[in-house]
Amino acid sequence: MIRKRRLKNGIRVVSERIAHARSVSVGVWALSGSVSETDEESGASHFTEHMLFKGTKTRSAQDIAREMDSIGGNLNAFTAKEGTCFYADVPAEHLHKACEVLSDIILNSSFDPEEFAREKNVVMEEILMSNDLPEDVSEEEACRIFFMGDRLGKPVLGSRESVDAMTAEGLREYWKRRYVPQNLVVSCAGRFDPEEFAELAERCFGSAAVRPSEPVLPNAYPGGRRVSFIRRNTEQVYITFCMPGFASMTPESYALCVLSNAIGGNLSARLFQVIREQRGLAYTVGSSPNPSTTTGSFEVYAGTDESRAAEVTRLMADELRDIRRNGISREEFLRGKEQARGSFILDMESPHAHMETIGRTALLQKREYTEAQILEKMDCVTIEQVEAVIPVVLDEANLCAAFAGRVGKARRELRNALGM
């Protein structure tokens, strides 16, 4: 059972007790992602994530690391397009310490200028690393041209230029605007006493000051058919198609999960069989739905030698056209549905997974979904629902494609393979 309450300052707290667990996972979620940023602030949410580990008024960065290591815990964070999560996974008896450390870094970070200057170099290196990975470059570019002009198309890391222009004081002001009680959720799952945790949450997070918050605008994709080529001196060309998807937790988003499994989400999927198993043209090939709060996208991707890039592109496009014309078989539907269900069950085997599920849905959906509720949504998907989303998702008029690698001489051939 999920318990929920709102602290006096407005922070929402959601928790789920798992009686058989020996550990506990606690997370703090903030409505702070790339969709929260202006062009000048691009990368600020991710940089803020880094800086909150760099010391508070009472703890140095080394103190934070040592305290968590001394209790055998794992302290980490991630930034996505719509939010940031800081979490600690610890043995159950150390929940108090985990909450104390998390609340301190979230509410009392110092943004020391010297730490900021050092960490800016770290963030720059992360951007450079991503720029060296053709799969990252291709996926980011496909997302950018698909959501052309919309904040969902912005990279979470930002750019070298935007990060280089940031100052410690400017980033601190961004943190103060985004990390306000109405934008925060605390989620906890594992073995703990619910009443004790309620008191602990109030004690650790109840002091956060109430400040005005900036709204996050709804997202949408403009539609249209676009292609982009990014030259990289790599052994492979990485190919990404980006197409329309659906908002999180909608019936259509669950139908798309099933369709994605049939297209490229498992070993028996169309693209895996046609491109890898039957022809040996690629090692990496797959598909992935990417839902957000108000809209979504769907990606199909592969990596292959430059001499085979056009053939792989043609095969990808041909399979998608065939599914658009003829749909998927009942056997593909049943396999795809059971794969979605089974993958979710396996993913939910840890307290951390439960913490993420209830925390993310509380932050973005303004309500909490249990494992059972999500499984019920999956079980309700019908083949008719999958057939209904196919013409929306696989509409060639809204297909965007990005290629990263040695693509200079092959641009015309790749365009022809796409039918562009």
Model-identified regions with their sequence ranges:
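Short alpha-helix boundary/capping segments
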Residues: 36-43, 247-259, 263, 267, ...
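Active-/binding-site microenvironments in catalytic and ligand-binding cores
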Residues: 24, 192, 220
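Charge-rich, well-structured scaffold segments of protease-associated domains
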Residues: 6, 61-213, 229, 234, ...
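His/Glu-based metal-binding/catalytic segments typifying zinc-dependent metallopeptidases
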Residues: 18, 27-29, 213-269
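N- or domain-start disorder-to-order transition segments that initiate the globular core
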Residues: 1-23
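M16/MPP (pitrilysin/insulinase) zinc-metallopeptidase core fold and M16-derived inactive scaffolds
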Residues: 20, 25-89, 262-281, 292
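A glycine- and charged-residue-rich anion-binding loop/surface
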Residues: 3, 15, 209-211, 220-223, ...
